[in-house]
A protein has these predicted regions:
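A short acidic, amphipathic alpha-helical/loop segment
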Residues: 22, 93-102, 126
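Short basic (Lys/Arg) and small-residue
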Residues: 134
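Sensor-1/coupling segment of RecA-like P-loop NTPase cores
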Residues: 103-126
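Walker B catalytic acidic pair
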Residues: 86-88
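Short recognition patches in nucleic-acid-associated and regulatory proteins
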Residues: 142-175
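Catalytic P-loop NTPase motifs of RecA-like helicase/translocase cores
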Residues: 90-92, 119-120
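Residue-level preference for the first positions of well-ordered beta-strands
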Residues: 4-6, 32-34, 81-84, 109-111
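Conserved P-loop
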Residues: 1-74, 118-129, 142, 170-173, ...
Length: 215
């Protein structure tokens, strides 16, 4: 039976790499897929990974009906044995509903990839809807690490290396350009303390010490 599968995780856990691997494995067996993406770091109409791999994709626009787009593709003689939706957290809730309809009405597997929460630890609407509708939610097993070495569970937005907790939910940044808007994965402890790798280096911090209560 076709499924809607949501592969989730923090940044740096290999979501886009897995999406590209699924595309490679299926195309090697003669299957053809439709790849949707939104706001990829490599630019419009691209699916890329941090390992440098990249392929062409369909850039999703605001208000675009993904089900109708796929039906139009098929009606014009196109083929789609599966659908990949990368950066799915940026999709609107109704677009996630449309992907579910692709599975149910067209009998086509849909593989969605995305991060679950934003830099404030709030669910992205697209990710929330995927959790609600997906036949399976797979948490990727490649663990991203916080600067302290602990498992990273939260995504932080930084400006000049300083963590910020206010601003628009979606701002495309770069993990390699610390002087602009960037992103970093942190463990919960250091996300709560707003302690990025840059701020930790600047303060030359020793291991965390619990506060001493005087009484």
């Amino acid at each position: 039976m076709p499924e809607l599968v949501f592969f989730s995780g923090t940044m740096d856990c290999g979501k886009s790499t897995l999406a590209l691997q699924i595309e490679h494995n299926r195309s090697a067996r003669g299957l053809q897929g439709m790849i949707f993406t939104r706001d990829d770091r490599a630019g419009e109409g691209k699916l890329s990974s941090r390992l440098g791999l990249v392929t062409d994709a369909v850039e999703v626009e605001d208000g675009q009906d993904l089900y109708a787009s796929l039906v139009d593709h098929l009606s014009q003689g196109g083929r789609a044995d599966y659908v990949i939706a990368d950066e799915a957290q940026f999709l609107a809730e109704e677009q996630i509903d449309q992907l579910a309809r692709v599975v149910d009405d067209l009998d086509i597997d849909v593989y969605a990839f995305g991060i679950t929460t934003d830099f404030r630890s709030k669910l992205f609407p697209g990710s929330q809807r995927l959790v609600e509708l997906a036949d399976r939610v797979e948490v990727l097993q490649v663990e991203a690490l916080c600067w302290c070495g602990a498992r990273a569970t939260h995504n932080a937005r930084t400006v000049g290396g300083v963590m910020v907790v206010e601003g628009a939910q979606v701002v495309v940044g770069d993990v390699d350009q610390a002087d602009t808007v960037g992103y970093e994965v942190l463990c919960r402890r250091h996300h709560r303390r707003r302690m990025t790798s840059a701020s930790a280096r600047a303060a030359a911090l020793s291991p965390d010490v619990l506060p001493v209560q005087q009484g």
